[in-house]
Amino acid sequence: KNHRLAGEVNLFNIENDRQAMIGYRISAAYQNMGFVTEALRRVIRFCFEETGIQRLEAEVMTVNVASNRVMEKCGFTCEGTKRQAKFVNIYTDFNIYGLLRSDIMGEHAAST
């Protein structure tokens, strides 16, 4: 409504083997309104429908309950936890999430 930037979704570490990392952040004023879920779903659709990306991966702090919930709502699978993976004031655990083209587009999409 107000045409202000509320947040962003980023793709990075895009690899030749058709994998990429995905991440996002949103201003505190716009949290818990569904904007991240909506934006992430659109970027996921774009990645799998318009590019050759086969797999998206994300790392989410285990203590960030809302962000872990967004991952699950968008169809990502928690594939494990990296213990004390990064220093964020203290050493922090991160859940690793993966999403395959076939998870969104169907099994036949894995070979395209």
Language-model region placement:
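Acyl-donor (CoA/ACP) binding surface of acyl/acetyltransferases
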Residues: 1-112
